Amino acid sequence: MRFKELVFLLKIDEEELLEKLYEEGFFNFAIEENKEGDRLLRVYLREGETLPSFLSNWKILDERLTTPKDWMVELEPFEIVEDVVVDPTEKVTRTDKIVVKLSPGVAFGTGLHPTTQMSVLFLKKYLKKGDRVVDVGCGTGILAIVAKKLGASYVLAVDVDEQAVEVAKENVQKNSVDVTVKRSDLLSEVEGVFDLVVSNILAEIHLRLLEDVSRVTHEKSILILSGIVDTKEDMVREKAQKKGWNLLERKQEREWVTLVMKRS
């Protein structure tokens, strides 16, 4: 599949950008920094797809036709956290580390973003072998795949976006792991009880998740919430506390915060 790639100078903060893109159901994008330190937004349009409306008056810096393989070619394998390697090339054969083969399809979710890195860090720390895990808002499926490779007995990955579900299924297959992937608006299609819930989405969506997450967890379950901009951390923590979740640990990279919680 060929895409039209458009490059813009990022004029708004990253959290506001993600909100606007998600509101329009747009997931084909990447955020990067050039040599001059400018933040750039790359968006990828399928044939017949329209540009998100808020970008219509932004100046286009560059435009070209491309494919998912084209935009991944510049990415080399990299260690997202200690002993966990993301491999966009599918050429890494080492067995001394957890290797995640990744074909994004959508650009966001390659593992380069600090929210993904912090989520993986806490999965390594809190996931116990044999745990049942659900990844809510799975995107490319990277967190679900890591959870399975860390020893989870059962992993469910859900996303409201059909395209993300298809990409996650493709990545699960590439990694030869047993992960169930399906479409669900947060936990609406999720049944059963899980030992660990991980979710790397926006703060406002976490508020919705917290309304229902107790239904699929037990008193010792761990909840990892990432994708929270620091100015909205208190809002999420207050909601979590009201719903019976206590803070175990937090980590911040740049303006992004990840929280680890346990039922009180």
UniProtKB/Swiss-Prot annotation:
Name the source organism: Thermotoga neapolitana
Main location class: cytoplasm
Q: Which Gene3D superfamilies match?
A: Vaccinia Virus protein VP39
Q: Tell me the function of this protein.
A: Methylates ribosomal protein L11.
**InterPro entries on file:** Ribosomal_L11_MeTrfase_PrmA (IPR050078), Ribosomal_PrmA_MeTrfase (IPR004498), SAM-dependent_MTases_sf (IPR029063)
- List where in the cell it is found: Cytoplasm
Record has Cytoplasm as a keyword: yes
EC number(s) stated in the UniProt entry for this protein: 2.1.1.-
Q: Which family does it belong to?
A: Belongs to the methyltransferase superfamily. PrmA family.
Q: Which GO terms describe its molecular function?
A: protein-lysine N-methyltransferase activity
SUPFAM superfamilies documented for this protein: S-adenosyl-L-methionine-dependent methyltransferases
* Reactions performed catalytically: L-lysyl-[protein] + 3 S-adenosyl-L-methionine = N(6),N(6),N(6)-trimethyl-L-lysyl-[protein] + 3 S-adenosyl-L-homocysteine + 3 H(+)
Q: From its record, what is one biological process in GO terms?
A: methylation
- Pfam families associated with the record: PrmA (PF06325)
- Output the Gene Ontology cellular-component terms: cytoplasm
Q: State what protein this is by name.
A: Ribosomal protein L11 methyltransferase
Record's keyword annotation contains Transport? no
Q: Which UniProt keywords are given for this protein, alphabetically ordered? A: Cytoplasm, Methyltransferase, S-adenosyl-L-methionine, Transferase
| Residues at which S-adenosyl-L-methionine binds | 116, 137, 159, 200
